[in-house]
Amino acid sequence: MNAQAEEFKKYLETNGIKPKQFHKKELIFNQWDPQEYCIFLYDGITKLTSISENGTIMNLQYYKGAFVIMSGFIDTETSVGYYNLEVISEQATAYVIKINELKELLSKNLTHFFYVFQTLQKQVSYSLAKFNDFSINGKLGSICGQLLILTYVYGKETPDGIKITLDNLTMQELGYSSGIAHSSAVSRIISKLKQEKVIVYKNSCFYVQNLDYLKRYAPKLDEWFYLACPATWGKLN
């Protein structure tokens, strides 16, 4: 937790915005209801998903607190789209702020305005890096890119490799978050990565044993972590 996030939390509470507690599998917002909010995820882990008409689930992004998630446009105060934000950690603490309240709060304090602006700026550059790597290297690049993201954000070094400490990360979940809906395609790529000793899967967890391989197929994402999150990048490099 950085100092800016702590100060933003205090600023919200000083202005009457109280934290809400959520539990695993709860939805902070869902794609069937209006979503004109700013969510300040203080702690916990969530995932942003979209469910198609035929029931296909796509995991668009994982968020780890502290993080700012915008579900409404600041200028029009309308929804940016219809998605689900599901809690996947045991508990999560979030501040749910109406867009008109956010505008008023940020107009009074440039420090917090720039904190939110910087966070959203990072999200845009992250999305560009992800789109680049997922597009250029096909399905293998998508899986390697998503594994690299999860390794940097949730990785912990162990004797067996870098353990991705995200609960219940199955091959199906990995496929959904990589934009691959067919489990057979995910299975083939995972088998290839196992054979090449890039990863192992045991005790319901992925272990990365060749980080350089993932970086080779996701260079822009690796570059993004190096530039935007140097402390996170430096722990494993």
Curated annotation (Swiss-Prot):
Residues 137-212 form the HTH crp-type domain. Keywords: Activator, DNA-binding, Transcription, Transcription regulation, Virulence. One of its GO terms (molecular function) is DNA binding. PROSITE patterns: HTH_CRP_1, HTH_CRP_2. GO terms for cellular component: cytosol. The keyword Aminoacyl-tRNA synthetase does not apply. It comes from the Bacteria. The keyword DNA-binding applies. Positively regulates expression of listeriolysin, of 1-phosphadidylinositol phosphodiesterase (PI-PLC) and other virulence factors. This is Listeriolysin regulatory protein. It comes from Listeria monocytogenes serovar 1/2a (strain ATCC BAA-679 / EGD-e).
